[in-house]
Amino acid sequence: VNLLQIGYRTLKTAVAAALAMWIAEQLKLDYYVFAAIIAILSIQSTRKKTFRSSYERIMASLLAIVLGFILFEVIGYRPVTLLIYFILFLPSVQRLRLQDGFITSVVILTHLYTERQLNAHILLNESLLLGIGVGVGLLVNMYMPSLDLLIDDRREKIDQRIAALFFEVAAAIETGRVNHHALTLDETERLLHEGKDAALKRMGNAIGRRNDDEDYAYFRMREQQFELLRGIVHHAEELVLVVEEGKKVADFFRTIGDNVRPEADAMVYISELEALLTRFRASALPVTREEFEVRSALLHMLQEAEQYLRLKQRYVNQKK
């Protein structure tokens, strides 16, 4: 089997399960296979999720032991005790937000039920199983491949696709012929999702840091800009003829395309756009219905371009 074809998370899960079970077996613990199950459950998509799920597993297991011991001592080791246990335990883990520990705690309870007692040996056995499973899971899941190259690649490609869309829109305004934008739009949307997911995952792996990330802010900004750009492309498809004002609008969109990089200050282009809108509104009224529709579409495109630029400027200001 080609190891490169196996997902790193699958590989980590297999290693954690085997290692946890081997340690528990070497210690001659009862139900040593349970350590492997805990280790498997501890492998999460990010380090922060792993720590959170491990915490929930430990706390839910402690609650299960205490509640189980009380009920078994009062009612006895009978099926009705399990019924009462679940009626009490389920709402408790939900209220305490310990849902990830539910399966682990149920297995521990079945061990107590099978043994029909709770003594120091059983308590130590269950504690070691839990500690080994959680500990191995945490240790193995500390390895997370770097996402920096993926994020940088998606940022570069997104900038290129957005610039290409502005150039295509400019060409459509000047010629009245619409290129097929759907593939570029779909690809840009896919790149945005991949980049944003990668940035979120990297934030989840950053232990001890705040939940902020410049790359995540970039993808959020581009995501909002993309929706505006989609509207601009839609209006470009409504252009049925070439009008005189279109040349200046096309030149302006090319300027935006040439300066699409996120760190570029947008205020100068916002001022240029406002001047263009003023001249646009002051120009002579359209003569034909087709000319009116084209100028209306151009006006909407400029208004959406203004929102696009203001989103960019807000992003630049937040970085300062």
Set out the residue ranges of the language-model regions:
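C-terminal membrane-adjacent module
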Residues: 145-243
